[in-house]
Amino acid sequence: MARYRHSRSRSRSRYRRRRRRRSRYRSRRRRYRGRRRXRSRRGRRRGYSRRRYSRRRRRRY
């Protein structure tokens, strides 16, 4: 029984990870569509340096 429970939790975590990745891409797309609204506190805390670098690079262009 314990073994089944463990495998079940493992598959659940895997599904959650895939879903999280999808939501991240979706949020990224939404930011481009609505830059003013999009700016969410959760996205800002996650990968803040990466966004800053991309912004600097875009400004140079």
Swiss-Prot record:
Belongs to the protamine P1 family. PROSITE patterns: PROTAMINE_P1. GO terms for molecular function: DNA binding. It is found in: Nucleus; Chromosome. Protamines substitute for histones in the chromatin of sperm during the haploid phase of spermatogenesis. They compact sperm DNA into a highly condensed, stable and inactive complex. The lineage of its organism: Eukaryota, Metazoa, Chordata, Craniata, Vertebrata. Residues 1-61 are annotated as: Disordered. This is Sperm protamine P1. Testis. GO terms for biological process: chromosome condensation; sperm DNA condensation. It comes from the Eukaryota. It comes from Notamacropus parryi. One of its GO terms (cellular component) is nucleosome. The keyword Metal-binding does not apply. InterPro entries: Protamine_P1 (IPR000221). The gene is PRM1.
